[in-house]
């Protein structure tokens, strides 16, 4: 009878095991019902005090997620809409100005809205990062038990695209925290412009992981991204380029890396996605997803599940 080493048996066992790719759910139905269907398929029930993280959109921008689209879901989870002030001037750089934008864009009509850095900031530890040791976020972040991340997927002038990873990194950071991310930890005040692009993208991934880690290692957070109004510019732009491609749908996952990867893949598959592809590639946008996977935030492999 042949004898086998423990190492050989371990190799056989590993070879027989299979990686369970995270599910990414998809619907073409960009409506309150479609949004609710994706939420239901995720199978995770928010508990405790629930934050709904989204972008309130710069004054002059009309591409942000509309209250008419998201209102039913926000009420379903009994959520408080949360945002932070910006670090680049504009209409959302100070709380009073930001509150006016929130009112003008209709968010007060569907839920309470919390500007999380209104009373200061707190630090979240970053583990396994190349650039960041901490992620500085709005102090009210600590008041929430669960986060539902509602993202409008679109292009971005600096990141190439804005997806779920950007929404929980730059989006949850205080103005000082935003500078830290944009400059890859080299400074915490002044201009956000930085010439080491990959370092900035990697810092976004590291900040996103800090947020996920703080929420039960990703157990108290879920992600839904809406692919409509697909401009090359972000909702933080008050004068964005008009979209020149068709709306695609709504996607959801418990894995933000898989979700962003799936959104990017759908842009590449679209027959009219050339402008957004050019924007993403010119900024090396996929590198945020690459680094997020490298540091263990999630998987670039996924199981695409249509719910239509």
For every predicted segment, state its role.
Residues 1-4, 263:
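Positively charged n-region of N-terminal signal peptides that target proteins for export
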Residues 4-8, 279:
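Alpha-helical transmembrane segments
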Residues 7-17:
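Bacterial N-terminal signal peptides
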Residues 21-308:
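Extended, low-polarity segments enriched in aliphatic/aromatic residues
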């Amino acid at each position: 009878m042949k004898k086998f080493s423990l190492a050989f048996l371990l190799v056989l066992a590993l070879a027989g095991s299979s990686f369970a790719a995270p599910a990414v759910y998809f619907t073409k139905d960009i409506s309150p019902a479609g949004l609710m269907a994706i939420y239901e398929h995720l199978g995770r029930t928010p508990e405790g005090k629930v934050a709904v993280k989204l972008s309130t959109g710069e004054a002059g921008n009309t591409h942000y997620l509309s209250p008419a689209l998201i209102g039913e879901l926000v009420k379903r989870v009994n959520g408080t809409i949360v945002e932070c002030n910006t670090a680049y001037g504009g209409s959302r750089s100070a709380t009073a100005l930001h509150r006016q934008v929130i009112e003008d864009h209709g968010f007060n009509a569907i839920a309470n809205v919390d500007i999380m850095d209104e009373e200061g900031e707190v630090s979240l530890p970053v583990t396994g990062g190349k650039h960041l040791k901490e992620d500085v976020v709005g102090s009210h972040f600590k008041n929430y038990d669960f986060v539902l991340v509602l993202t409008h997927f679109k292009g971005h002038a600096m990141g190439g695209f804005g997806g779920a990873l950007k929404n929980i990194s730059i989006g949850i950071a205080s103005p000082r925290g935003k500078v830290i991310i944009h400059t890859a930890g080299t400074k915490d005040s002044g201009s956000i412009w930085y010439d080491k692009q990959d370092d900035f993208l990697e810092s976004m991934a590291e900040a996103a992981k800090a947020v996920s880690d703080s929420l039960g290692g990703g157990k108290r957070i879920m992600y839904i991204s809406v692919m409509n109004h697909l401009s090359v510019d972000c909702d933080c732009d008050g004068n964005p380029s008009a979209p020149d491609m068709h709306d695609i749908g709504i996607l959801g996952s418990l894995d933000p890396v898989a979700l962003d990867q799936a959104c990017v893949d759908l842009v590449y598959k679209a027959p009219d996605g050339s402008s957004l592809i050019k924007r993403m590639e010119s900024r090396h946008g996929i590198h945020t997803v690459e680094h997020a996977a490298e540091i263990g935030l999630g998987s670039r492999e996924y199981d695409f599940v249509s719910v239509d």
